Each structure stands twice: as structure tokens, then as C-alpha cells.
Amino acid sequence: DEMYDSWSELLTELYVLNPELNIVFTVSPVRHAKDGLINNNQSKSRLFVLIERLKENFPLSYFPSYEIVVDALRDYRFYKKDMIHPNEQAVDFVWSHFVKTYYTETNMDLIKRISKLKSAKNHQIMNPDEIEGEKLKKWIFEERNKLNEEIGGNFNL
């Protein structure tokens, strides 16, 4: 099958580059109504079968965002007015399940630090020459450098 062969080739290359890679697949809960609901369901069914086949041969996981929205949040109050896209409440619900499933405490701490750093960077300093403004700029610089050392990259806001 063409889809399987393409994905298999890509995943093989990725795992050669990084054997510790954690790959998560999901199927979008958004309906592609413009293709017709029958075609949408057939397409998603093919994706489910593909992912199951890939899981048999590669160390990857599946996150059930489709199932959460379609089954757990099956009420249309969880959709936007177009009745196709999940609303903010549904997205938050799915995201909270994703975080509980895949994030470690270390990940969560890192996300909090990055959010705090982004907020500080976006803060409007009334008078940048004042001592408080200088302290904030210094803290942003130092915190960004600490993050770069910890994550081994070039973290830039």
C-alpha cells in the first residue's frame, strides 16, 4: 500500500537519525465536509488502519483526539457554529488529555518557565532606562541562556 510504504520509509529514516525519537500519531476530529461525509469517514478509516499497521512495525504511539471529540464530546455544543470544527472548550479538553498522557513533570516545568519568559519579554516597560526595566532585561537574557544550556539548543523568543 502506497501510504504505508511512504510512511514506513520516512519513519525508518527518522529512527536511524534518532533512535530515541517519540512519535505520536493522531487523527484529526475535524470533518472534511467539502469532500462529503462518506469520503471523510472512509479517509479517516484508512488512517486508522495505516496507523495500526505502522504501530506493528515501529515504536510509535497513537493519541485518540478523534475518539475524544467524536465519542466523549459527541454533543454539538462542543463544536463551533460551522458544526465542523471543535470549539475552544473541546480543544482545551483534548489538550488536557494529551498533556496528562505525554508530558512529564519536567516538561511541565519547562513549559511554565518558557511561558513566564515569553510574558516577561512581551511586557511593556514604561521607561526602559529605569532600574526595573534593566533588571527585567537582564533576567530575560540570563533565563534564556539557562534554557539554552538545559535544552541544548538555541532558544530564542
Residue ranges and their predicted role:
Residues F58, K81-D82, D92, S96-L157:
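Conserved catalytic region of serine esterases and O-acyltransferases that act on ester linkages
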Residues T12-N41, I114-K121:
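Active-site segments of SGNH/GDSL-like serine hydrolases
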Residues N22-V24, S45-D75, H97, I111-R113:
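Extracellular serine-dependent O-acyl
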Residues D35-E56, Y79-K80, I84:
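Non-catalytic scaffold segments within catalytic domains of secreted glycoside hydrolases
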Residues E2-V24, E56-P59:
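Secondary-structure boundary elements
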Residues L11-Y15, P19, R31, E52-K55, ...:
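Hydrophobic/aromatic-lined pockets within catalytic cores
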Residues Y66, Q89-D92:
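N-terminal targeting/trafficking signals and adjacent low-complexity tails
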Residues M3, W7, L47, V91:
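Aromatic/hydrophobic pocket-lining residues that form the small-molecule binding cavity
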